[in-house]
Design a protein with these regions (language model features):
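Long, His/Glu/Asp-enriched segments that create or flank divalent metal/ion-associated functional microenvironments
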Residues: 145, 149-153
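Extracytoplasmic/secreted cell-surface and envelope-processing proteins
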Residues: 74-78, 134, 312-315, 425
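Edge strands and adjacent loops of beta-rich recognition modules
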Residues: 342-363
Length: 557
């Protein structure tokens, strides 16, 4: 069983992780010797007694916890647990549990691994620092640190998203956060992650490093922080409002994290109260003091790269990569300028329609017919105190178009939204919607077109505006489409190196009789997509709301 698990996991990422471990954990550090599943040589050849010895050594009462969550009699369950487990004796002179430490490094560590099945470049930049000890996690300072990590990650994501939207994006995707160092819990790291194609490796990794240094040198702006703070408070408020519906699995995972890592479990009521008190009191200057302490360039720098092994592609050597990063460090990196629009989502509201008729259903919902002909189905529920779900659909879809347009048709759902809505790009839209819990997406399927989304009672008006704009204000942005194209090219360039690509292509071809609408997008097709025609098709499908049915359920009267 273990061998099969090891075999099924052994993809390009696993093989490269095994190559990287001795480099990112040098000098024989125990982390360098194996991944948690172990070495296949040991798995296939260990004596049975070794397994029993390991069990006796580590599976003992002082090392174990019992978490039980569900609908039961607490007193009775406690008695059963005590009666079953209290008789297990603690061993005499038990083995001491130890935590493997990760030493600092003065010179940069560069670790590069290649694999022929790797489809894209995936690189990590770590700036190691001391982590917060488990025994200090019960303090208020630790909660403040968790809050700071959250908002820093959100603000960094916004900056990187802007770069990813450029016509010639420096990477396919990227993130910056403060987290554990690689696979170890005993060391923290200010971490940057990026995905690119092999040709764009140099640009991608230097851009990521530059943005990390921009944060460390200049911090964040007040407007960035206000958005991130609003998003955090909205997230906490939503969890608080839904506290009566918290699942047993959520409680269980929270208790397990407490047992294993001493993560605090104050409960959502306490956490909500803390966030309402602390977030308004923590200024952007405090956040910047925190973030500027996370990394330094004179030591503890580690770069780990997982690279496609492609014939003819030359990556920089370890020395060349260090020189590239040193050149970025020498740059005069300017502070980030946050471009924020004060324009409202909709500058003018449309003229109100009216309800022509309504009808109650025996199934508990109400059907409304609007003056424009659209149907609205509404059912108020109490399953979730802070959620409204929405769907809309209309018959038609891609089936109304000629098969010769298959290429434009099958990317319509993905491409139609890359430009944003109204006067807002996707990045600008995310800034305008900061602090609001609202989502919406539009699709054009084979036999229908539609929308789906969700919101909260307090943000229902924003959802309604987004629905209206999705019909009337689809935004064409040639730069955003070019960015999407370039990212698709980067992702698809080495897709054929993944054995699952050939398997999936063959399966789809057989299941759908080579229907061109069902086949996956190919590298050679990306440049052939007609963006203007895709947007024309999208606008045709959403030209008239009269034949749409809108469904709203949840906490909505």
């Amino acid at each position: 069983v273990i061998t099969e698990e090891w075999r099924s996991r052994r993809d390009a990422s696993q093989r490269m992780y095994e190559q990287l471990l001795p480099k990112v954990y040098p000098d024989g550090n125990p982390y360098s010797k194996r991944l948690p599943i172990g070495l296949i040589e040991t798995i296939q050849n260990f004596p049975y007694q070794a397994l029993r010895d390991y069990y006796e050594k580590w599976y003992r009462p002082d090392q174990q916890g019992i978490v039980v969550v569900g609908d039961f009699d607490v007193d009775e369950m406690e008695k059963k647990i005590i009666s079953i487990f209290s008789t297990i004796a603690k061993p005499v002179n038990p083995a001491e549990r130890f935590y493997v430490q990760v030493p600092d490094n003065k010179e940069p560590i560069i670790a590069m691994a290649k694999d022929k099945e790797q489809q894209y470049v995936q690189s990590y930049i770590f700036m190691k620092h001391e982590d917060i000890p488990d025994e200090m996690k019960s303090s208020l300072n630790y909660y403040i640190t968790l809050y700071a990590k959250q908002v820093v990650g959100r603000m960094a994501a916004q900056r990187l998203a802007e770069l990813a939207e450029l016509p010639e994006p420096p990477f396919i995707d990227a993130a910056i956060m403060d987290d554990d160092y690689f696979i170890s819990k005993t060391k923290g790291a200010f971490t940057g992650i990026m995905i690119s194609n092999e040709a764009g490796f140099n640009t991608a990794i230097t851009t990521l490093y530059r943005e990390m240094l921009r944060i460390l040198r200049h911090g964040f702006t007040a407007s960035e922080y206000e958005r991130a703070k609003a998003e955090f408070l909205t997230m906490i408020e939503s969890a608080y409002n839904q506290r009566a519906k918290t699942t047993s699995a959520s409680y269980c995972s929270e208790y397990v994290r407490h047992f294993i890592d001493n993560e605090p479990i104050p409960g959502i009521e306490t956490e909500y109260a803390l966030s309402q008190q602390l977030a308004p009191a923590i200024t952007v200057d405090i956040i910047n003091q925190y973030v500027m302490s996370l990394g330094q360039t004179d030591s503890n720098l580690v770069v780990a790269c997982m690279l496609p092994d492609v014939e003819g592609v030359q990556y920089p050597t370890e020395q060349e990569l260090v020189a590239m990063l040193k050149a970025v460090e020498a740059e005069n990196i300017e502070p980030y300028v946050d471009k924020v629009s004060n324009e409202p989502l909709m500058s003018e509201l449309p003229e109100k329609g009216s309800i022509k008729k309504s009808k109650e259903s025996v199934l508990g919902y109400t059907e409304y017919t609007l003056s424009n002909g659209a149907k609205v189905y509404h059912k108020e529920t109490d399953f979730n105190a802070d959620q409204i779900l929405f769907r809309a659909y209309s018959k038609g879809g891609l089936s109304l178009y000629d098969e010769a347009e298959a290429l434009n048709l099958k990317v319509a759902s993905e491409v139609m939204g890359v430009g944003g809505l109204g006067n807002f790009s996707t990045t600008d839209l995310s800034k305008v919607l900061a602090g609001k819990k609202v989502s919406i997406s539009s699709t054009v399927n084979t036999f229908s077109e539609g929308m789906s989304g969700s919101t909260t009672p307090k943000d229902i008006e924003t959802l309604m505006q987004l629905i209206y704009m999705s019909f009337t204000a689809m935004r064409t942005d040639d730069d955003a489409f070019k960015s999407w194209q370039n990212k698709q090219i980067a992702l698809l360039k080495n897709a054929a190196t993944d054995p699952m690509t050939a398997f999936n292509d063959t399966l789809v071809a057989k299941l759908y009789s080579n229907n061109p609408l069902a086949t996956q997008l190919k590298l050679e097709d990306v440049e052939k997509i007609d963006y203007a025609r895709v947007m024309e098709i999208a606008r045709e499908r959403y030209a008239n709301a009269a034949d749409f049915s809108f469904i709203f359920t949840g906490k909505i009267s």
